[in-house]
């Protein structure tokens, strides 16, 4: 019997340019609802992403350093819905910080449903103290840019 038949699992997909406290918060909250979480470090063709292998390694190191159980970090270069089908996972978790995120996430959820109608997206709203954190802001700060530069 596979893990997914015994336990309720979900997918936490993202490019994870920086796996930050907002992501970690969503992961910990998801583990309260799900028995197992696959963090899927993915490619987003609409974003400029750093090397998939490097991003995967950074996320895996972070999870290992925190000794978080019932999580597996995966690198994936295809559709998230394909990963879900292969693993027979019906839930994807996503975070929402604001109205702009909501619009984008609704669009993405519709795509997931078109690709595989068994998928459901479970949303976690950012905690107030974390809603201004984003990978892009962290990258820009590290480069000495303000929040609005790309």
Swiss-Prot record:
GO molecular function: ATP binding; pantetheine-phosphate adenylyltransferase activity
Pfam family, one: CTP_transf_like
Residues that, per the record, bind substrate: 15, 80, 94
Main location: cytoplasm
InterPro entries: Cyt_trans-like, PPAT, Rossmann-like_a/b/a_fold
First-tier enzyme category under EC: transferase
Biological processes, Gene Ontology terms: coenzyme A biosynthetic process
Annotated site location: Transition state stabilizer: 23
EC number, as in UniProt: 2.7.7.3
Location(s), subcellular: Cytoplasm
One Gene Ontology term, aspect cellular component: cytoplasm
Cofactors required: Mg(2+)
Pathway: Cofactor biosynthesis; coenzyme A biosynthesis; CoA from (R)-pantothenate: step 4/5
Keywords, in A-Z order: ATP-binding, Coenzyme A biosynthesis, Cytoplasm, Magnesium, Nucleotide-binding, Nucleotidyltransferase, Transferase
Catalytic activity: (R)-4'-phosphopantetheine + ATP + H(+) = 3'-dephospho-CoA + diphosphate
Binding site for ATP: 15-16, 23, 95-97, 105, 130-136
Function of the molecule: Reversibly transfers an adenylyl group from ATP to 4'-phosphopantetheine, yielding dephospho-CoA (dPCoA) and pyrophosphate.
Assembly information from the UniProt record: Homohexamer.
Membership in a protein family: Belongs to the bacterial CoaD family.
HAMAP family: PPAT_bact (MF_00151)
Name listed for the protein in its UniProt record: Phosphopantetheine adenylyltransferase
Provenance organism: Malacoplasma penetrans (strain HF-2)
């Amino acid at each position: 019997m596979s893990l997914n038949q015994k336990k309720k699992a979900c997918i936490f997909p993202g490019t994870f340019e920086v796996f930050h406290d907002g992501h970690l918060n969503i992961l910990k909250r998801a583990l309260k609802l799900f028995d197992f979480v696959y963090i899927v470090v993915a490619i987003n063709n609409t974003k400029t992403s750093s090397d998939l292998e490097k991003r995967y390694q950074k996320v895996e190191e972070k999870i290992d350093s925190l000794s978080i159980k019932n999580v597996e970090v995966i690198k994936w270069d295809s559709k998230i819905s394909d990963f879900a089908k292969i693993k027979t996972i019906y839930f994807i978790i996503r975070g929402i910080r604001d109205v702009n995120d909501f619009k984008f996430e609704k669009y993405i959820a519709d795509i997931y449903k078109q690709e595989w109608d068994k998928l459901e997206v479970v949303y976690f709203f950012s905690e107030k103290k974390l809603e201004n954190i984003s990978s892009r802001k962290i990258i820009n700060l590290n480069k000495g840019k303000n929040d609005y530069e790309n």
